[in-house]
Amino acid sequence: MSGHSGHDVKYGRHRTRRSFARISEVLELPNLIEIQTASYQWFLDEGLREMFRDISPIEDFAGNLSLEFIDYDLGEPKYSVEESKNRDANYAAPLRVKLRLINKETGEVKDQEVFMGDFPLMTEMGTFIINGAERVIVSQLVRSPGVYFNGKLDKNGKKGFGSTVIPNRGAWLEYETDAKDVVHVRIDRTRKLPVTVLLRALGFGSDQEIIDLIGDNDYLRNTLEKDNTDNAEKALLEIYERLRPGEPPTVDNARSLLVSRFFDPKRYDLASVGRYKINKKLHLKNRLFNQTLAETLVDPETGEIIASKGDILDRRNLDQIIPNLENGVGFRTLRPTDGVMEDSVLVQSIKIYAPNDEEKEINIIGNAYIEENVKHITPSDIISSISYFFNLLHGVGDTDDIDHLGNRRLRSVGELLQNQFRIGLSRMERVVRERMSIQDMTTITPQQLINIRPVVASIKEFFGSSQLSQFMDQTNPLGELTHKRRLSALGPGGLTRERAGYEVRDVHYSHYGRMCPIETPEGPNIGLINSLSSFAKVNKFGFIETPYRRVDPETNRVTDKIDYLTADEEDNYVVAQANSKLDEQGTFTEEEVMARFRSENLAVEKERIDYMDVSPKQVVSVATACIPFLENDDSNRALMGANMQRQAVPLMHPEAPFVGTGMEHVSAKDSGAAVTAKHDGIVEHVEAREIWVRRVSLVDGKEVTGGIDKYTLRKFVRSNQGTCYNQRPNVAEGDRVVKGEILGNGPSMDSGELALGRNVLVAFMTWDGYNYEDAIIMSERLVKDDVYTSIHIEEFESEARDTKLGPEEMTRDIPNVGEDALRDLDERGIIRVGAEVKDNDLLVGKVTPKGVTELTAEERLLHAIFGEKAREVRDTSLRVPHGGGGIVLDVKIFTREAGDELPPGVNQLVRVYIVQKRKIHEGDKMAGRHGNKGVISRILPEEDMPFMPDGTPVDIMLNPLGVPSRMNIGQVLELHLGMAARALGIHVATPVFDGANEEDVWSTVEEAGMARDAKTILYDGRSGEAFDNRISVGVMYMIKLAHMVDDKLHARSTGPYSLVTQQPLGGKAQFGGQRFGEMEVWALEAYGAAYTLQEILTIKSDDVVGRVKTYEAIVKGESVPEPGVPESFKVLIKELQSLGMDVKMLSADEEEIEMRDMDDDDFTNQNDAFNIVQPENAAAEKTE
């Protein structure tokens, strides 16, 4: 290594960065959108099959016909991804299912293939295309099914317990203690019963049986006293009365009700994850840990003693007897009588001494390891969960923390789709059953039985309107990637914003390496929407796992063997940090190592370490890992930094940061915005729109050339957010490429790296107060050289429909429009590509037939002379809205004749794309990567900017007061290191938690020949004098955010009014006015500005007659007339009259003012020079 700290690392083909990382990466980052693609693949391979298996066979009520699902296959999609986007269609493939109908009376079998609707496919990028728009299905964090125990204090401060058995779907079972030490059960949220009633109903009728089963104790005695039933049948009737109040109870009904509630797999489903969690929780291994045996354990087969009475079961003893436990030690077969189920129940029961009372023996009952494929609850589950509850009262067992990630799981795309599909199938099943009983059994075919409507509808509903199916954030590649890795606790079956408390939202120790503690939205969703950590994976049960390096217990060496652990597995181990020092062999060099165990950070002897972190950045998400010097920023500001990077607008000339973290390449590659090579090969041909790669493969050590892969690049397409999506080649002809390499840069990418902004020269200084309150002062050079210029594409559409009075027509023959306005329209009335348009220009000329009114003689004469045209149409052309001017980029025309699919009633659809080049502007919002955001307040000429001793003017001035109180010092370190990197002509990588430290920064500054304090003298550009103090000047990476002033600027003279109050609407989207509210009125009253106040409350707002006359007067240049009565005052009077009050208006000389009646409204509105009256909800339609 040369004289500097750090070493060179290559990122992709074109970029080398000097990395300051000290920890070598043991594990490559996984594919970052695997959470989407793997889950959907599971659904196609297994999820669908599982569902058809669950529902099959469907039998009719008599049991004569049975319909079975044999197999399914997905055909080829109707349109390609690109075509689906252009045609506003779904990217979907037809699902065909093979059905078999068996007539049991005749033994006849009919096989048939049935089409079951088009099924949306996932693109390679992990998105779906629904109605032409890219959407993402966000994974949902929900409480895992299983059994949970929690401690609670009642109002007298007495400690009690509660417990819940939560299924995936089905009835809940809850246990709780009350103030009198009685244990109650609630079945499906009904009123509570003593828990012994449930045990009797399961077939343990007498008090003695229950005491023998659970073990004698005070709680049980109290509960038996409270219980008024004394046998199984009475207990069953008691439960039936609770569940079905008001129906006459019979024992048989009660039995079948309980069976259907709990033991019927169709009505009660734990899912495999629920069965796994229940078996794990009720397993005797964890419950016997550190307890003292109260009986001698004997192997039932050999008769040998495994453990004797009085033994303490520590980890070693326990590990020895676990195999015996699972082979039947302590198994008891219970024979219930008269209960719900006739079958005998197998449980496992072992006696120990209670830890809080050495004399007392207690029974620990397990569920005897039920098979994984039993998805419903069983009597032995119920008995062992009741046993666990009683054990808790004696101090055996643990309560659960529901915010622990071992108890929360992810439902990803595949499972969400499966649940939705299941709803559709079960609706279909009902229809099939009905049809089976109605139709002729001899002639019926599967096709006639099946109605695919409910299935298609449920899928459509899920993709179109579910809370978890979201319009993809495509502002830039990072936003796209983060959206696919988002985890939401909201949505159907999840939490709601209002109900979620602080605990759920808080950072939990089990989030380590699984969910990012930093990246979450500010506002009402904070902590409910999270991001997956960079190395995390999701296992088959939906729990998030994170990788750790295993420590060999014999040698205490850290190996390169990687284990993925879920949160509850990790709870058993001590984990060392990634930056613990190791020698060459992988042994810890220090005797005491900083490590984590559950929620504690401890210094531990090195022999006790079980695992070690894989990488320092495994804690944080991808967006957070893109912030250099994250370790020097306050967490609140880091949160803003991570969130604002996702809002960066793609620039015309993007530039990768001088100071990066090494994540830029990976995140760009996996985001789906770049073009990546599908196979190894040699680039044969490169042009702006296409790259050809000749495949090369190794066969028996020889290179063999194969076919050509053609990659199309997307040029100047509109993204979901209206930014410009443009791909540029990143390779040259003759280059050798490997699979997965970036061939073409997407938006916001530079040489295969994420490039959200630009490196600019920043000085921390004030300048005439223009950067007060985080405002930013900028040099005009950034405007002139298009440094922060971005391209925006907006889409406008116009459709010609059939109306009652005849079809609308697209034409350039528009009433009352001069030839000048039509100069850029072609003969069909559609704008030409390349035309420059301004606000209110015509894009598509369109006329709509008007209702025919009776004509006067004069009008008839005019018609006779000038022909029909003048009469029956009005102008409904598409015009450029305010702030939408630009250059016409593209025009797409869809017509019925050309065979395009259009909505019913639409004959022709025209889409016009207008592109704008937006330079940076005062009022635009900019930010760094450390949460340092601000609005541009002034753009100064270059010659007025402060300049450095060599004459270079700075680009941006930031307020130094923005740093100390916000505690984001990372920006200052980035500033100095960036300056040094630019001077040395290198790019650097400083990974999070393992990047450049202070010495590294200063040594790089020195190497670059800068001053020791990295500050410089600046001269005032206006006077040429030096400023008093030395100033920190350096290179910072600044991004332009999607909050641009062009989208917010808005002005109105006249426009639409609300229907009832006749006041202007609000908001830019409705072309509304500025509200002059109650407080503003007080301000004018305080000034005594009577006339100003009068016109604001009348002619500028809702004095209908007055505003028309005022408008006329201004146009004609006359004086403004007297204001009339505001409409809202009339509304008030009408409201009072509706209460039965007689209210009159009097003028100053006590004459009654006649209120203009509602019939006159039409008259004024027709004469209104700017007609537009809108109901208030019309606003919503316009914003669509």
Curated annotation (Swiss-Prot):
Reactions catalysed according to its record: RNA(n) + a ribonucleoside 5'-triphosphate = RNA(n+1) + diphosphate
Entry-linked Pfam families: RNA_pol_Rpb2_1, RNA_pol_Rpb2_2, RNA_pol_Rpb2_3, RNA_pol_Rpb2_45, RNA_pol_Rpb2_6, RNA_pol_Rpb2_7
Enzyme class label: transferase
Molecular-function GO terms, alphabetical: DNA binding; DNA-directed RNA polymerase activity; ribonucleoside binding
Signal peptide: none
Sections of the chain in a coiled coil: none
E.C. number(s) listed in UniProt: 2.7.7.6
Alphabetic keyword roster: Antibiotic resistance, DNA-directed RNA polymerase, Nucleotidyltransferase, Transcription, Transferase
Mutation effect (D473N): Rifampicin resistant
Superkingdom field: Bacteria
Stretches for region Disordered: 1160-1184
GO cellular component, one term: DNA-directed RNA polymerase complex
One GO-annotated biological process of the protein: response to antibiotic
Assembly, per entry: The RNAP catalytic core consists of 2 alpha, 1 beta, 1 beta' and 1 omega subunit. When a sigma factor is associated with the core the holoenzyme is formed, which can initiate transcription.
Function: DNA-dependent RNA polymerase catalyzes the transcription of DNA into RNA using the four ribonucleoside triphosphates as substrates.
Family, as annotated: Belongs to the RNA polymerase beta chain family.
Protein name: DNA-directed RNA polymerase subunit beta
Lineage, top ranks: Bacteria, Bacillati, Bacillota, Bacilli, Bacillales
Name of the gene this protein is made from: rpoB
